[in-house]
Structure formats: structure tokens, C-alpha cells
Amino acid sequence: MKSTTIIGIAGGSGSGKTSVTNEIMKNLEGHSVALLAQDYYYKDQSHLTFDERLETNYDHPFAFDNDLLIDNLNDLRNGKQVEVPTYDYSNHTRSKETIAFEPKDVIIVEGIFALENKTLRDLMDVKIYVDTDADLRILRRLLRDTEERGRTMESVINQYLNVVRPMHNQFIEPTKRYADIIIPEGGSNKVAIDIMTTKIQTLVSKQ
């Protein structure tokens, strides 16, 4: 059975991970490629009250169900379909709905802590860290959370200063050392993306 190439893409919130992911997926036409976002795997918090959920630190590694993500990746690599969880951002807990996910030639795992967990890293054939200046990251997060997630500007800024920035410095930035390649400037760095795409195509052809 043909194996699956697993790519990990990490970096701070608003660094351009999604742009890099989209560019790589676009450049891998001819192969079956799918995104498995780490955000799908926020832990179920249905046992907590809504107010308690608001106090959860979603920028800490413990907010993610990495065990389920790892199990899903192992099953996909073994040719099995999996049910991927979905997350309800308005209620801050896991949705009841799941998404049927089929094995692919390439699976991209994208998330702020994609390189933080050693067991997860060990499943990856290529590890990428997207490195972007903090000023640009906060602006992107501000736009995303106000426009897509219904947040107020004040709440986003307060969260960034009190939670996101310290968590980035403590947990996310250090994972840069595990990357096979560091991509500055996110999706606008066409040279780095082309290099990574060529490497991934070589790996896929050998599977």
C-alpha cells in the first residue's frame, strides 16, 4: 500500500501558516492532498460552563487533544478513514458533528503547536516553521478574530498582550528548532515555498 507523506506546518498565530499551506497544496496538483488543521482538535469542553470555557487558555498546548490527532494520523497512514472533530468557536467547545476524512497522498498538519509534541513530530516527514514579525501577526489576528469570530477589538488586544504573546514566547517560538526549514514572510516567500514543494514532491514519488 502506498504510504502517506505527512507535513507539519507551525508558527505563531497570524504568521501566515494558512497561506503557506494553500500555496503548497496548489503546487502539489496531481497528488491527493488534504489539510488536517490542529484547530479541529481543541479539547471537548462540554462539561464546563460557558463562563468557565471563556477562562480557558486556548494558546497553551494543553488546549489541544493531540492524542486524538495522533491516532487519526496513524489510521490515515494505515489506509483507514477517520472521523475528524469540528469545533464551535461561538460556544467554545467541540461540535457534535464530525467530518469523514479519507487517506491522501499528502496530509498537511497545520497549527501553532504542530511541532510542539514529540510523538506528533515523529510522524512528520517534513517539518516547517513559518516565521513572521510580531507586529504583523497581531494585525492579522485582530482582523481574523473580529471579522470571522465575532470578537471585539479590545478583547483581541487584551488576549494578545496577556495570553497570546507570553504563550508564543514560551511554547511556540522554541519549536522553531525542530523545523527542517524556517520560512520567513509566510505565504509571500515564493522561493522557500517552491523549494519545499520540490522536496515534498520527491518524497511523494518515493512512497
From Swiss-Prot:
Residues reported to bind ATP: 11-18
InterPro entries: P-loop_NTPase, PRK/URK, Uridine_kinase, Uridine_kinase-like
Pathway named in the protein's UniProt entry: Pyrimidine metabolism; CTP biosynthesis via salvage pathway; CTP from cytidine: step 1/3; Pyrimidine metabolism; UMP biosynthesis via salvage pathway; UMP from uridine: step 1/1
Signal peptide stretch: none
Major localisation: cytoplasm
Keyword terms, alphabetized: ATP-binding, Cytoplasm, Kinase, Nucleotide-binding, Transferase
Presence of the UniProt keyword Coiled coil in the record: no
Descriptive protein name: Uridine kinase
Organism: Staphylococcus saprophyticus subsp. saprophyticus (strain ATCC 15305 / DSM 20229 / NCIMB 8711 / NCTC 7292 / S-41)
Gene: udk
